[in-house]
Amino acid sequence: LMKYWTPFMAPCFGTIARIARGNGHTKVLCQIDNVEPHERHLTDKPFNRYYLRAVDGFVYMSEQVHRELEAYSKAPALFSPHPLFENFGERVARSEACVRLGLDPAVGYALFFGLIRDYKGLDLLLDAWAELKRAGRAEGRKLIVAGEFYTPKERYLRQIADNGLQDDVILHDRFIPDGQVKYYFSAADFVVQPYKTATQSGVTQIAYQFCVPMVVTDVGGLAEIVPDGRVGYVCEPT
């Protein structure tokens, strides 16, 4: 049983799978997070072919991934949704969460959580927040951005400054330990995932665990697990 999430690992994983199957009776199964990566490279397709054609069966977590997988392999595939997490603890009182994070409990908070990469659309969210502010619809609310930057953060800092959002965006640009995750989701009124591309997202499952409504974009598998108007809202990524 193997796990696959990026073509970068395909040369190694594909070789291991072929060696394992070389005895003629061992079957290789794969729990697959992504087929096509969020940031594309010329080697993605040949690397994917090398690994995925050496696998006897798959478990996928969204129909988006299943559709991409079918372009490479006709091996049996089983759907199993992304599970909820158990390692982040239980929801705490909002007042306690605000104290822990140094937040004003009188303010409403939107939360953008997790690794900050181009495809996650933080730039879209900042532009949208600026529009809300100009329209007078962001009064009494702030945006928490919590996570490590995997792309140069200077462009986002410029965007915040250019839009006059210095007092509207609370930036916790660091790794968030498991023990602190519950405070962010307990303090938030809703979670925002303005992704430009996606398959499925662990952030969505954390929001479910802590019973926090979501606003997500209609990309990849996000809309599959966030019914519009029931547990949140689905919008276009523009």
Enumerate the predicted regions with their spans.
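Donor nucleotide-sugar binding/catalytic pocket of nucleotide-sugar-dependent glycosyltransferases
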Residues: 53-92
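A short helix/loop element that forms part of the nucleotide-sugar donor recognition site in Leloir-type
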Residues: 89-103, 110
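Conserved donor-binding/catalytic core segment of Leloir-type glycosyltransferases
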Residues: 104-120, 126-129, 143-144
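Glycosyltransferase donor-sugar binding loop
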Residues: 142-155, 174
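Nucleotide-activated donor-binding/catalytic signature segment of Leloir-type glycosyltransferases, i.e.
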Residues: 154-175, 179
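Acidic donor-binding loop of glycosyltransferase active sites
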Residues: 183-201, 209-212
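Short glycine-rich donor-binding/catalytic loop of glycosyltransferases
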Residues: 196-197, 203, 212, 216-223, ...
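Conserved acidic donor-binding segment of nucleotide-sugar-dependent glycosyltransferases
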Residues: 228-229, 233-238
